[in-house]
Amino acid sequence: MAGPKRFNNKDKRPKRPAQNLLFKRKRFCRFTVTGVEEIDYKDIDTLRDFIAENGKIIPARLTGTRAIFQRQLNTAIKRARFLAMLPYSDQHKI
């Protein structure tokens, strides 16, 4: 005998609006395109683009940066923070 039908949790989840699914920009690694071999901690303008408003480093899944450059980027940002070129938090202006 067959038991009662069971539903997956997928069926009970609310549906996402179609608007979010329509516009997806293809992410690309900025450093690969420009041919950068190594990220320098003294290039503050580039590093600022990868820091969120609250002071956190933006993850690679959002920026599209390749893993090798994301590691270099993290190291460069941390060095620039240590040398007071970049702020640690959002309490200070960049």
Curated annotation (Swiss-Prot):
One GO molecular-function entry: structural constituent of ribosome
InterPro entries reported for this sequence: Ribosomal_bS18, Ribosomal_bS18_sf
Family membership noted in the UniProt record: Belongs to the bacterial ribosomal protein bS18 family.
Annotated protein name in UniProt: Small ribosomal subunit protein bS18
Summary of the function given for this chain in its UniProt record: Binds as a heterodimer with protein bS6 to the central domain of the 16S rRNA, where it helps stabilize the platform of the 30S subunit.
Keyword entries, A-Z: Ribonucleoprotein, Ribosomal protein, RNA-binding, rRNA-binding
Gene3D superfamilies in the cross-refs: Ribosomal protein S18
Subunit structure: Part of the 30S ribosomal subunit. Forms a tight heterodimer with protein bS6.
Origin species: Albidiferax ferrireducens (strain ATCC BAA-621 / DSM 15236 / T118)
A GO BP annotation: translation
Domain of life: Bacteria
Keyword Protein biosynthesis: no
GO cellular component: cytosolic small ribosomal subunit
